[in-house]
Amino acid sequence: MSKTFKAIRDRTYSGVGDLIKLLPTGTVFLFQFLNPVLTNNGHCLLINKYLTGVLIVICAFSCCFTCFTDSYRTRDGYVHYGVATVKGLWPDSSSVDLSSKRLRVGDFVHAFFSLIVFSVISLLDANTVNCFYPGFGSAGKIFLMVLPPVIGVISGAVFTVFPSRRHGIGNPSDHSEDDASEMK
């Protein structure tokens, strides 16, 4: 391997590492665990391409869906999860006022940018690149190096403007102040 390729690879991994912080960790772990197996470490047959495509679609859906999930604690102390709707969380709870957890514009912004970030991570993964577009030239390698940090900066700025207060599946909050004020 040439020094240039190693430097590009290292910068790409560094940029991808920063982007991963913006996504659900379980989804990213699942992708990183299964992608080398499904792509045959980048040496794909047609079936490998289909299976990898399905994995990418499922993980992308998961990244978007988790932006619309939230959790709450009931009076009995149990944490429950739900999906944000226009009226609050579904399924509804009779012991907690969930109207403050209704759908917001920021949820759609987070879902869109989570999809963008996951797309960059999944489609620029070394195994995915070798599988789907093995003839990536030198211009493509520059693209691999530049795109993750650019998307990371843009997404980070957008996530700063639209902070998420959701504590979805796998991310329960401490619920100390939020749910105490929501009890009926």
Curated annotation (Swiss-Prot):
<dbReference type="InterPro" id="IPR007770">
    <property type="entry name" value="DMP"/>
</dbReference>
<feature type="transmembrane region" description="Helical">
    <location>
        <begin position="19"/>
        <end position="39"/>
    </location>
</feature>
<feature type="transmembrane region" description="Helical">
    <location>
        <begin position="45"/>
        <end position="65"/>
    </location>
</feature>
<protein>
    <recommendedName>
        <fullName>Protein DMP2</fullName>
    </recommendedName>
</protein>
<keyword id="KW-0256">Endoplasmic reticulum</keyword>
<dbReference type="GO" id="GO:0010256">
    <property type="term" value="P:endomembrane system organization"/>
</dbReference>
<dbReference type="GO" id="GO:0009838">
    <property type="term" value="P:abscission"/>
</dbReference>
<keyword id="KW-0472">Membrane</keyword>
<feature type="transmembrane region" description="Helical">
    <location>
        <begin position="105"/>
        <end position="125"/>
    </location>
</feature>
<dbReference type="GO" id="GO:0005783">
    <property type="term" value="C:endoplasmic reticulum"/>
</dbReference>
<comment type="similarity">
    <text>Belongs to the plant DMP1 protein family.</text>
</comment>
<dbReference type="GO" id="GO:0009705">
    <property type="term" value="C:plant-type vacuole membrane"/>
</dbReference>
<comment type="function">
    <text>Involved in membrane remodeling.</text>
</comment>
<dbReference type="Pfam" id="PF05078">
    <property type="entry name" value="DUF679"/>
</dbReference>
<keyword id="KW-1133">Transmembrane helix</keyword>
<feature type="transmembrane region" description="Helical">
    <location>
        <begin position="142"/>
        <end position="162"/>
    </location>
</feature>
<keyword id="KW-0812">Transmembrane</keyword>
<keyword id="KW-0926">Vacuole</keyword>
<dbReference type="GO" id="GO:0005789">
    <property type="term" value="C:endoplasmic reticulum membrane"/>
</dbReference>
